[in-house]
């Protein structure tokens, strides 16, 4: 959902450039939002808060953050907690232009963190998207040639490899701590030797061995 939300920035931009979104479509969109999420119960967070947050943030993406006075009155009245929270997430998405694979990845990573911060504030379960969602890497040619140890930290995790039924390792970017890849634990090799072998490879070598797609910028 969060990744799709950022991609919708590009989709909506193209649709509006080609005049595919008019007032009728916008009215239908608002009706769809009202049909999807109920108004908040007074003064408390319920089980629908997460859905409200996602739906309203997507609404802001659809309208480029600009609602009519009438629509704004409706959402602020019906969703007094979720609406300002959605505005915060939208501010993360729209802080910088989303127009390249690199800027899209950056927005997704920041959105994962902002979403979890909001879930924590509401005392709701967090997504842990930074650790458990693998986001495709966007690398420069120089980064391709770096050793894995220069760009990533590899850790034990609670993830299980679905084929080997063993615990997996995750590779986190040093810069933003986002999950970049998941490695199955070796069946027989000691972990120290395994880590050294992985860290000694270039990033390009590791990704090619894993058949892991990435984008060059």
Q: Where do the language-model regions lie?
A:
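Post-HExxH zinc-binding segment in Zn-dependent metallohydrolases
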Residues: 1-27
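Pan-zinc metallopeptidase signature
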Residues: 22-177, 183-189, 215
């Amino acid at each position: 959902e969060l990744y799709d939300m950022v991609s919708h920035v590009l989709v909506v931009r193209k649709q509006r450039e080609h005049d595919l979104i008019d007032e009728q479509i916008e009215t239908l969109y608002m009706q769809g939002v009202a049909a999807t999420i109920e108004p908040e119960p007074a003064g408390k967070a319920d089980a629908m808060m997460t859905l409200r947050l996602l739906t309203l943030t997507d609404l802001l993406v659809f309208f480029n953050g600009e609602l009519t006075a009438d629509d704004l009155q409706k959402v602020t009245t019906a969703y007094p907690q979720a609406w300002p929270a959605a505005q915060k997430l939208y501010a993360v998405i729209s802080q910088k232009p989303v127009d390249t694979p690199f800027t899209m990845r950056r927005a997704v990573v920041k959105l994962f963190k902002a979403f979890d911060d909001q879930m924590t504030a509401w005392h709701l379960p967090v997504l842990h998207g930074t650790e458990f969602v693998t986001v495709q890497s966007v690398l420069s040619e120089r980064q391709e040639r770096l050793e894995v140890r220069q760009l990533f930290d590899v850790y034990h995790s609670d993830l299980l490899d679905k084929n080997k039924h063993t615990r997996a390792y995750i590779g986190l970017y040093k810069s933003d701590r986002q999950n970049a890849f998941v490695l199955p634990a070796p069946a027989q090799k000691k972990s120290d030797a395994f880590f050294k072998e992985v860290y000694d490879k270039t990033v390009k070598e590791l990704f090619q061995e894993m058949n892991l797609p990435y984008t060059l910028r």
